[in-house]
Design a protein with these regions (language model features):
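Phosphate/diphosphate ligand-binding glycine-rich loop within oxidoreductases
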Residues: 1-56
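Short, hydrophobic beta-strand segments that form beta-sheet elements in well-ordered domains
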Residues: 1-4, 99-106, 185-188
């Protein structure tokens, strides 16, 4: 049995001949109570808007001139969410509470939320938004769905990816981070994380020059959420083994 306390599966090689997939199940009702990742996304958006990347003082940065760190507010901003899944729906609640107008785009036309405005294309969502949040599940169909063209629409905007690195054309992303006219970018995920993200060294070489925040896939890494998901997995495994023995 393979049990994984994650929402993504691209770290499990289910094509491996040694792994016999009998069934694949997600405990989505339980996951609705797990808030670590949406809280991280919300925190990243505030960090970008308020220029925390450069405003945190340290031994190396003693600049007390607040005018150089002047930022923006969530109140009155337009937030665009790509993917109205579990995390997307929670984010709608968070940003509404702070006075933002929330837009969303999802290929599933049945998904809706009274607190957000549906947009009919990804391009229109990006154009309508001040902050663009990528929050889709990774599937082979989503591989590289964000290309150089979509990235070019982010000029003058903030962008957050906590989905998976593989949903982006990362070569185009690196080029855009170096040359684009965006306001800020936050990345919690990169491709090939298990083997060491190939893009990481290049990003770290330039992130200090831009309003770019990189976190090591810590979206779900809180004591509370990890404890609850790990306990849930043990509980479900025990139930499965008990049924097999019966």
């Amino acid at each position: 049995y393979i049990c994984s306390p994650t929402t993504g599966l691209n770290h499990i090689d289910i094509s491996n001949d040694e792994i016999k997939v009998i069934s694949l199940k997600g405990d989505y009702a339980f996951l609705n109570s797990i808030r670590a990742t949406p809280e991280h996304i919300f925190g990243l958006s505030i960090a970008l808007l308020r220029n925390y990347h450069s405003a945190f003082l340290s031994k190396e940065n003693r600049n007390w001139n607040r005018d150089e760190y002047r930022g923006e507010e969530l109140q009155g901003s337009n937030v665009g969410i790509i993917g109205l899944g579990r995390i997307g729906k929670i984010l709608v609640q968070y940003y509404n509470a702070f006075g933002s107008t929330v837009y969303y785009y999802d290929i599933d036309k049945e998904k809706e939320d009274d607190g957000a405005i549906r947009v009919d294309s990804m391009d229109n969502l990006i154009n309508a938004s001040d902050i663009v949040i990528l929050s889709i599940n990774y599937t082979p169909e989503n591989d590289g769905i964000i290309t150089k063209r979509e990235l070019s629409l982010l000029d003058g905007k903030y962008f957050i990816n906590t989905s998976r690195g593989e949903v982006l054309d990362e070569c185009a992303l690196l080029e855009y981070i170096q040359t684009g006219n965006y306001k800020g970018i936050a990345l919690d995920v990169l491709s090939n994380e298990a083997d060491g993200p190939a893009l990481l060294d290049d990003l770290l070489a330039i992130e200090h020059k831009k309003n770019v925040i990189i976190t090591p896939h810590i979206g779900g890494a809180t004591f509370q959420s990890m404890r609850r998901t790990e306990e849930r997995i043990v509980e479900k495994l025990k139930e499965t083994l008990a049924r097999k023995e019966a």
